[in-house]
Amino acid sequence: MEKINNWEEVEAKGMEDFKPLPIGAYECVIKDARINVNEETGKETFKVSIDIATGDYKDYFKNRYEKNTNADKKWDNNAVRYLAYQGDNVAYFKGFITSVENSNSGYKWDWDETKLKGKKICGVFQYEEYEKQDGTRGIKVRLNKFRSLDKMKDIEVNDSVKLINGSYVSYNEYNGTKTINNSANIEDFGDVVEITDDILD
């Protein structure tokens, strides 16, 4: 084996450095909000990127981004939601906007999405199944929905797993049908999305 370049300068890391995010409802801050156009389908969605704002997991996704040593590192897709806002989905998009308004005193949506940056909102993170590059499946903790901050204390997050087909099973039932364990299934850096430098401000 040939010696790796900069071996002496590389900081050693172990699995103990990775602290998985538990499922639950968190006070979050919006880091970025913009119209997203799918390059393949041309479909427009409203992309919202967030981070944890308070508590033991404050800046969780920012810290993961900064610790990622990959040259093409990107913001973790587990902290991003793509919201449809056309046709029958208008009501759901309005639900998101209303949650932002209710969570930020004095804020009123004026159709300028750049003003959403820095606004607080409740983010609910739950288990979700995904397909790995080798074709096998595992689960990860991903942003599932938004709620108003005043509703956060009443939110009960169960341990159900959202499957790829859209249905739900309990975490124990999922593990019962897979030869997997908790630590092996939570993806470390998961899917990622491209960000700009100002998202970290």
Question: For each of these PLM feature ranges, what is it?
Answer:
Residues 1-201:
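Short beta-rich binding modules
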